[in-house]
Each structure stands twice: as structure tokens, then as C-alpha cells.
């Protein structure tokens, strides 16, 4: 500190006017400061050294043209302003506390301010870096990381700290919050601010960042935010992103950010049973991602390299959910699948019994809420035979639902595999609304066994539909004492879904309202 500074302002950095002798009334001269107290030899020595080191008085500059006129003008202005104006002006330069009546205002004033600062941060890299002033006490009070940095066992004594991995705007947002509780984030800075808040353990600011992201979550940024949520370990935000992707899958996978996600995020999405999109469109999106990943890894974009970068993600594409036409026109010709896989899938599409394939054939259901089911029979009996004729029953409901599958009876002869084709037909137009050619395994019990559609089938209120199941396999159990009307009541809302069953005209393999197959309808409301 310069010898002319005030002893009561020792913590102030050079050049900041905060006390007498700095821009105000003249303080003691250098020679006066060097005068020791009588009888104090140590002080005398120190004062002598200070006096020797102090520069001599600076000679006044020679008067230039107009100097006298300028001085006279200044005197006239001071007289016009009144005798106390100059003193008030000088006081305002250092007595900033007087205009800040609350602690919050005083600390907010110190934000990004050289006044009283005792540490500087060199934030960022290269030309974009900034030198930001701060106050150790304020930072230590607001952050355990800063507390350890300044006061812990390995505390730094440096007054300049480099932070090359932090963005200046994000660090300023962090300081703004620590000094004033004010949240200053926007779309361009929220992710870097979240990173900085986590780095310095400021959970309240983390929560503000996550809340901002939730409010601004859309289909076109869901994948980008999902990647960041997984990176920063924000499970609640990640869950919201996945729900948004489920509901808006088609829009999300066409957004620019989709091809920028990492492999683990891609796998997390492909594992979901709740994506609302046809599998062939999902495959096409994954192919686009593989091209971008090849470029990131500086690999030539070839079918072999696409397969390489996809890794385990390829096994999560549910090729059996495609139609044979979709598979033949796309995946079969892509070169990503090996010949053995292509042949196996073509056999799966065309022959019965269907050979097992390496790929998942479980349908994706894009519906939210709890799965429901009703059973129309009150009792189970033995021996129901099959000769290639469909078991059919007509039904209607009182409200809109989505049917995702049927529960069917299995063998009376122990564990057995069945081949089955299930359909829902619009009765009046004879239009097939949904079907699946698949199979199921049973354990020989009288339980029902789930057989699911590839996609949910929308069923409208008070419209007649026909449920069909064509089984190939040994004699099975069957239901008796059938109910014409069955009501499902939601345990949470009390809402009622009422099914009415009727005889379906034609050959039904014996199934009717009273007895037969297709005991169970599985649906979402």
C-alpha cells in the first residue's frame, strides 16, 4: 500500500479510492508516515526503510496553453455549485455504504467489483478469458468448495486463480447468485451454469438451472438435454426428457440434436418400450446417427463401420415389428445386417412355426398410464381344439380405449409353444385395424398368456369390433360361464370402462359369449 494511503483501509486494492488521502482531503505525507514514535527503534528502522524506498515528490508539469484558463473555469464552477458540493462529491466516491442500507444491497454492490476484493479469477481460455474480482469470505460462505479452497488444509494463498474449464458468463452467473441470490441464466448459458454450479457445490443454483430446462423442454431439444442430464447426473430431468421423446418420438428423432447424442444415450432410448413411432422410421434415424458417429470417429461411412459404431444399439432395433415390405425395402438392403440375420428375419416373417430370431419382438406401446385388463369368463374347463379356424367374439366399449393385446388360454398337456395370429377387425367395414403373427409359450396351467399387437389399436366408443385369434397347437383350456357385460373400474380415479360382448356371425371355432377362447382384453384408457 502506498505510504499516502489510510491505515484503516489496508485491505483495499491499489487504485480504489475508499478513504482519506485518496482523491479526497490530503492525507499525511510520505515523510510524515515515516516519522517513528519516540523510543521505538524497530519502528524507526522500518520508517527509515520506507522513506528511502519512497519516490521523491513529482515536479509539477510546466503550464501549457490554456492551463490558467482551465483552472479559473474550475474555480468558477466550484463556486457556482456551492461551498459543500465538492466535499459531497468526494465523499460519494468512497462512502458507498451510505447508499446501501441493507446487507443484501451491500453484498450485491460488491459483485464483480474491485472494492475490497482479495482474489481474482482468470476464467476461460484464450481471447475469451476474463479476469474477475471476488471476495474470499463471500465465496466461502456460499460454497463448500470455495471454503475448502480458501480455508481448508490445502488452502491456496494465491490471489490469482486460473479456471480454464469454466465459461466466464457461467462463472459470473454463479457469483451473481452467491452475492445477491439473483438468478441470471438464459438458453445460451444454462448448461454451462449448471456445470459450474455442480463444480462448486451450489445446489440451489443447480435447482434453478434444472427448473429452467424443464420449462424449456421441447421435442427439438429433448435429445440434447437428455445427454446433458445424463452427463450431470440429473435423473429427474433425464426422466422428463425421455417422457417427451416417448410422446414426440417422430419430431425428436428428426431434430438436429439427435445425431449428436452419445452411444449410451442412444441405447437408453432404444431400450424403451414406450416410443411412439414405427420401427422402420426408428431404424432410419439410427442409420443417420451411425453416419454422424462414423464422421466423429474419422471412419469411412461404410455398412461395416456403421455396424461397428452402433455396437449393442443394433440389437435393440425391433426388426420383427416391421412388416415384411418395410424390412425388405430398408434394413434388408442396408448392408448393416449380416446375411444370416437377414435370412432369419425373412423366415420369421414368412413361415410357421416362426424360428427364433436374435432381435426383440416385444411391441413398443406408446401409451401413458396403467395397463388394464378384463376377463369375460368366470370358470375354466379343459379341452378346446384347433383346426385352422379363427376363434372370434364381437365387442364394443363405452369409451375410447387402446387395445394392446389379448390373454389366451394355453395347453392342457403341460408346457407347450403355440403359433397364433391375432386381429382386431372393424365389424361393419371388415377392415383389419391391427394384427400380429406371433407365438407364445404356456406352462400347462389354466392361466391366460399374453399375446400383444405390434402397435396399440384404437377402439372408439359404441362401435362394433371383432376380436380374432387363430391358434396352431394342441388342445387347450377354455372359458365358461361367460359374461355379456364386463366393467373395469380404475382403482385410482374410479372411472369405469364397460365392455359388451356379442356373438360374431360366421364360423368362430365354437367361441361365443358363453364359452370359448379370447378370455382377456388388455388395454389402456
Swiss-Prot record:
This is BTB/POZ domain-containing protein 2. Pfam families: BACK, BTB, PHR. Residues 27-55, 66-86 have a biased composition (Low complexity). It comes from the Eukaryota. GO terms for biological process: neurogenesis. Its main location: cytoplasm. Residues 117-187 form the BTB domain. Residues 1-86 are annotated as: Disordered. Residues 56-65 have a biased composition (Pro residues). The keyword Nucleus does not apply. It is found in: Cytoplasm. SUPFAM superfamilies: POZ domain. The lineage of its organism: Eukaryota, Metazoa, Chordata, Craniata, Vertebrata. Residues 16-26 have a biased composition (Gly residues). Signal peptide: none annotated. Interacts with topoisomerase 1 and with TRIM5 isoform Delta. Keywords: Cytoplasm. GO terms for cellular component: cytosol; P-body.
Amino acid at each position: 500500500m502506498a505510504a499516502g494511503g489510510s491505515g484503516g483501509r489496508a485491505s483495499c486494492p491499489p487504485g480504489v479510492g475508499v478513504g482519506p488521502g485518496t482523491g479526497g482531503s490530503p492525507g499525511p505525507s510520505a515523510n510524515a508516515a515515516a516519522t517513528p514514535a519516540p523510543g521505538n527503534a524497530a519502528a524507526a528502522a522500518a520508517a527509515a526503510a520506507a522513506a528511502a524506498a519512497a519516490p521523491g515528490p513529482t515536479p509539477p508539469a510546466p503550464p501549457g496553453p490554456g492551463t490558467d484558463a482551465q483552472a479559473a473555469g474550475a474555480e468558477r464552477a466550484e463556486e457556482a455549485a456551492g461551498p459543500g458540493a465538492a466535499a459531497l462529491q468526494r465523499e460519494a466516491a468512497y462512502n458507498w455504504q451510505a447508499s446501501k442500507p441493507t446487507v443484501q444491497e451491500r453484498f450485491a454492490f460488491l459483485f464483480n467489483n474491485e472494492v475490497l476484493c482479495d482474489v481474482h479469477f482468470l476464467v476461460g481460455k484464450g481471447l475469451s478469458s476474463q479476469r474477475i474480482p471476488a471476495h474470499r469470505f463471500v465465496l466461502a460462505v456460499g460454497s463448500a468448495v470455495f471454503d475448502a479452497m480458501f480455508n481448508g488444509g490445502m488452502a491456496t494463498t494465491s490471489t490469482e486463480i486460473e479456471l480454464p474449464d469454466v465459461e466466464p458468463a457461467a462463472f459470473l452467473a454463479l457469483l451473481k447468485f452467491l452475492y445477491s441470490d439473483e438468478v441470471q441464466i438464459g438458453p445460451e448459458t444454462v448448461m454451462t451454469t449448471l456445470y459450474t454450479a455442480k463444480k462448486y457445490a451450489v445446489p440451489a443454483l443447480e435447482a434453478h438451472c434444472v427448473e429452467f430446462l424443464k420449462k424449456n423442454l421441447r421435442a427439438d431439444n429433448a435429445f440434447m438435454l437428455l445427454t446433458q442430464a445424463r452427463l450431470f447426473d440429473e435423473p429427474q430431468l433425464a426422466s422428463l426428457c425421455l417422457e417427451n421423446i416417448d410422446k414426440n418420438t417422430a419430431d425428436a428423432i428428426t431434430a438436429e440434436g439427435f445425431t449428436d447424442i452419445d452411444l449410451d444415450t442412444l441405447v437408453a432410448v432404444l431400450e424403451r418400450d414406450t416410443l411412439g413411432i414405427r420401427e422402420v422410421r426408428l431404424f432410419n434415424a439410427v442409420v443417420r446417427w451411425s453416419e454422424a458417429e462414423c464422421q466423429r470417429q474419422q471412419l469411412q461411412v461404410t455398412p461395416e463401420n456403421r455396424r461397428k459404431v452402433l455396437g449393442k444399439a443394433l440389437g435393440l432395433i425391433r426388426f420383427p415389428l416391421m412388416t415384411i415390405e418395410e424390412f425388405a425395402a430398408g434394413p434388408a438392403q442396408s448392408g448393416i445386417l449380416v446375411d444370416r440375420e437377414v435370412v432369419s428375419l425373412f423366415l420369421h416373417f414368412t413361415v410357421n412355426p416362426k424360428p427364433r430370431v436374435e432381435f426383440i419382438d416385444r411391441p413398443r406401446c406408446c401409451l401413458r398410464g396403467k395397463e388394464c385388463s378384463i376377463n369375460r369368463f368366470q370358470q375354466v374347463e379343459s379341452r378346446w381344439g384347433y383346426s385352422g379356424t379363427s376363434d372370434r367374439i364381437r365387442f364394443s366399449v363405452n369409451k375410447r380405449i387402446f387395445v394392446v393385446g389379448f390373454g389366451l388360454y394355453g395347453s392342457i398337456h403341460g408346457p407347450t409353444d403355440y403359433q397364433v395370429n391375432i386381429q382386431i377387425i372393424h365389424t361393419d367395414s371388415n377392415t383389419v385395424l391391427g394384427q400380429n403373427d406371433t407365438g407364445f409359450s404356456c406352462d400347462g396351467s389354466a392361466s391366460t398368456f399374453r399375446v400383444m399387437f405390434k402397435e396399440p389399436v384404437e377402439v372408439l366408443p359404441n362401435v362394433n369390433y371383432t376380436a380374432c385369434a387363430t391358434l396352431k397347437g394342441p388342445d387347450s383350456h377354455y372359458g365358461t360361464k361367460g359374461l355379456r357385460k364386463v366393467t373395469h373400474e380404475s382403482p385410482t380415479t374410479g372411472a369405469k370402462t364397460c365392455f359388451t360382448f356379442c356373438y360374431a356371425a360366421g364360423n368362430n371355432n365354437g367361441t361365443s359369449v358363453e364359452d370359448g377362447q379370447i378370455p382377456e382384453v388388455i388395454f389402456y384408457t
